Amino acid sequence: MSMNPAALIPPADSIPVHWAWLEGFLLLTFGFHLLFMNSVVGSAVIATVRAVTRPQDPAPTLLGKALPSLLALTINFGVAPLLFAQVLYGGFLYTSSVIMAVYWLGLIFVLIAAYYLLYGFSGSRRKKKNGTVFIAAACALLLFTGFVLVNNVTLMLSPDRWVGYFEKQDGSMLNLGD
């Protein structure tokens, strides 16, 4: 007998205002988060490429000074849309987060490491060292963060894949099918 994936969908919670208010705030705050996120990832990639191809170029040094602050702003501006999504789609977001809990909770440590690596890159550039390893590793961690976040959202949107949890109950399931 196969399980009906629709049976796994939790009932909707009541919300204190009309959903359109929360949806509007979600879209507004997520837009700000996207602006900062694109600035961080784009600047980190540019700094990595320039540090490798033109080590004496001042652009990576200037970007290195700004990147830690940009990452902090990106994280702060990412909290509000996450909270609005939790209110609007709580049952789905919570379930997908539990299914991939190892990666979801690991994001805290990944972002802390990326933050320190960005500071390491900035410090190495001030000391007239290249620091390519720092920025390349930070780029990899930032891209991994994006992968995990997108994976969580696609898993949230695919309740039919939640039954895979019963085969792999250690919280390390990823939605690699999309």
Label each residue range with its predicted role.
Residues 41-60:
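Membrane-interface helix-loop junction between the first two transmembrane segments
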Residues 46-48, 82, 150:
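Hydrophobic alpha-helical segments of integral membrane proteins
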Residues 35-45, 110-113:
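Hydrophobic alpha-helical transmembrane segments
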Residues 69-136:
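Membrane-interface helix-loop-helix modules in multi-pass inner-membrane proteins
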Residues 69-77, 136-155:
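Hydrophobic alpha-helical membrane-insertion segments
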Residues 27, 58-69, 125-144:
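Alpha-helical transmembrane segments and their helix-start/interface "positive-inside/aromatic belt" motifs
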Residues 1-30, 58-59, 81-102, 155-178:
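Membrane-interface interhelical loops and short amphipathic "cap" helices
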